[in-house]
Design a protein with these regions (language model features):
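Conserved Radical SAM active-site core
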Residues: 1-145
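Auxiliary Fe-S-binding modules of radical SAM enzymes
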Residues: 47-49, 112, 134-247
Length: 247
């Protein structure tokens, strides 16, 4: 009734390896891994609703990509950044082995080899330089040039969240976001879908379009953004009006 076509499944990397409660819940439900449960959930939603599942479960193996491919028309994972400097102590990716860019790029490479339609992108404002953003976009472009499987590039601006280690971290400016969108458009050309989450940059829709986006991404009139619950989705009518005004 709301016109939705896709169901997004987004989650952390293999929570059962870190949290006892996650392991116990999987055992109670009759699954050995989170990915097995995700495959079953995606299949159930697809069959019951007709919505197309999009899986974003983080770093996965080739076999897990194949299992998800059977029930999900598309998959995805943010590269975030190729900067290994961010893995060092005191930086954004310290203590997060699944944020290692080589590990993430390997999963994306397998997705290309397996012809899995894939969404990726970068996260800006986490301590990276402009040069490192370009290097990250180049890594994604190289993958796409080889496999042709990237269907969308996301330029996402960091938003500080209470209760996290980066709660006091300064958020990137609008100028930095627009610069990065423009760089991505120049690098990927006119055919690539490039998006920036509209709920993370309210009241700037025209500027985002002029910088180079041509896709608003997944915007739900039914559910909140569970990753960024403090940032409500803009109304679809407003997005349509702003898009039309920008030509």
């Amino acid at each position: 009734e709301a016109g939705c076509q896709e169901a997004l499944f987004t989650l952390g990397d293999k929570p059962e390896l870190r949290y006892t409660q996650a392991r116990h819940e999987l055992e109670r439900l009759g699954y050995e891994t989170t990915i097995q449960y995700l495959v079953a959930a995606a299949e159930a939603v697809r069959d019951a609703t007709g919505l197309l599942p999009h899986a974003n479960p983080g770093v996965v193996s080739r076999d897990e990509l194949l299992a998800l491919r059977a029930v999900c028309p598309s998959q995805g994972m943010m590269l975030e950044s190729v900067s290994r400097r961010l893995l060092e102590k005191g930086n954004a990716h310290y203590g997060s082995p699944d944020k290692d860019p080589e590990v993430r790029l390997e999963t994306m490479r397998w997705a290309g080899e397996l012809r899995v339609p894939y969404t990726s992108g970068i996260l800006i404002g986490i301590g990276e330089t402009r040069e490192e953003r370009i290097e990250s976009l180049l890594a994604l472009r190289d993958l796409h040039d080889q496999y042709g499987h990237l269907q969308e590039i996301i330029i996402q601006n960091f938003r500080a969240k209470e209760g996290t280690a980066m709660a006091q971290w300064a958020e990137p400016s609008l100028d930095e976001l627009l610069w990065t969108i423009a760089a991505a458009r120049l690098m990927f050309g006119p055919r690539m879908a490039i998006q920036a989450p509209p709920n993370l940059s309210p009241d700037t829709f025209g500027a985002l379009i002029q910088a180079g986006i041509n896709d608003w991404g997944g915007v739900s009139p039914v559910t909140p953004d569970h990753v960024n619950p403090e940032a409500p989705w803009p109304h679809l009518d407003l997005l349509a009006k702003e898009t039309e005004a920008a030509g």
